[in-house]
Curated annotation (Swiss-Prot):
Protein's membrane topology: Multi-pass membrane protein
Main location: mitochondrion
Function text: Putative antiporter that exchanges dicarboxylates and sulfur oxoanions across the inner membrane of mitochondria.
Protein name: Solute carrier family 25 member 35
Subcellular location(s) per record: Mitochondrion inner membrane
Family: Belongs to the mitochondrial carrier (TC 2.A.29) family.
Organism: Bos taurus
Pfam (any one): Mito_carr
Gene name in the database record: SLC25A35
A GO CC term attached to the entry: mitochondrial inner membrane
Length: 249
């Protein structure tokens, strides 16, 4: 739980500070390996950078790279703070007398920091590439134009379907749990359910009694069933459309 809380706390902060990260990245790349006065300064200071990026690239550009930034913060700070929290809760940072040991505390912090940085480094690179992308007139540093899959590739459809499969499972599992229970509940002589009055009642009872996690019971099995089903459905649908449009042009 320490890992989860630490990661979520860092993500919450990242939502508000990511625009500053975009500005910082652009300013750090400006004039890379060039002597002062030999290059055009697109960003004179922090405030000018905010205005310039918002005006030329659009306000949405100030949140560029937000997805990898959130993942980076969740992994790095979740591992860093979570590991340190576990060490503290386990009593590894204190002496036999109960006082804080500075050496152990520093060692635990360093180890947690190294682990977080090592795992977060690839994501930080992706974040930097995205945040550096800008319109030609205010571009600084090397401009990456990543394209993992070629257009119209079956891999694009497969990757998109995998992501949408996760979204479908997250959205539908509570209703799947409730429908399973509604169909399985005992009934009286008139066929009326003895445990739930209907869909809403089943949702409320499950949430009150079993909590939010009760609404997601069997989510792993749901994904292994619904995930491949969604993936294959969208994949075949995309391929059939490509074949159809190819031969009807």
């Amino acid at each position: 739980m320490d890992f989860l809380m630490s990661g979520l706390a860092a993500c919450g902060a990242c939502l508000f500070t990511n625009p500053l990260e975009v500005v910082k990245t652009r300013m750090q790349l400006q004039g890379e390996l060039r002597a002062p006065g030999t290059y055009q300064r697109h960003y004179r200071n922090v405030f000018h950078a905010f205005i310039t990026i918002g005006k030329v690239d659009g306000l949405a550009a100030l949140q560029r790279g937000l997805a990898p930034a959130l993942l980076y913060q969740f992994l790095m700070n979740g591992i860093r703070l979570g590991t340190y929290g576990l060490a503290e809760a386990g009593g590894y940072l204190h002496t036999a007398e109960g006082t804080l040991n500075p050496v152990r505390s520093a060692a635990a912090g360093a180890l947690a920091g190294v682990m977080g940085a090592y795992l977060g480094s690839p994501i930080y690179m992706v974040k930097t590439h995205l945040q550096a992308q800008a319109a030609t007139e205010i571009a600084v540093g090397h401009q990456y134009n990543h394209q993992i899959f070629p257009p119209q590739s079956w891999k694009v459809a497969l990757a998109a379907a995998m992501v949408s499969g996760i979204a479908v499972v997250l959205a539908m599992t509570p209703f799947d749990v409730v429908s399973t229970r509604l169909y399985n509940q005992p009934t009286d002589a008139q066929g009326k359910g003895l445990m739930y009055r209907g869909l809403l009642d089943a949702l409320l009872q499950t949430a009150r009694t079993e909590g939010i996690f009760g609404m997601y019971k069997g989510i792993g099995a749901s994904y292994f069933r619904l995930g491949p089903h969604t993936i294959l459905s969208l994949f075949f649908w995309d391929q059939l459309r490509m074949v159809y449009y190819t031969y009807t042009k």
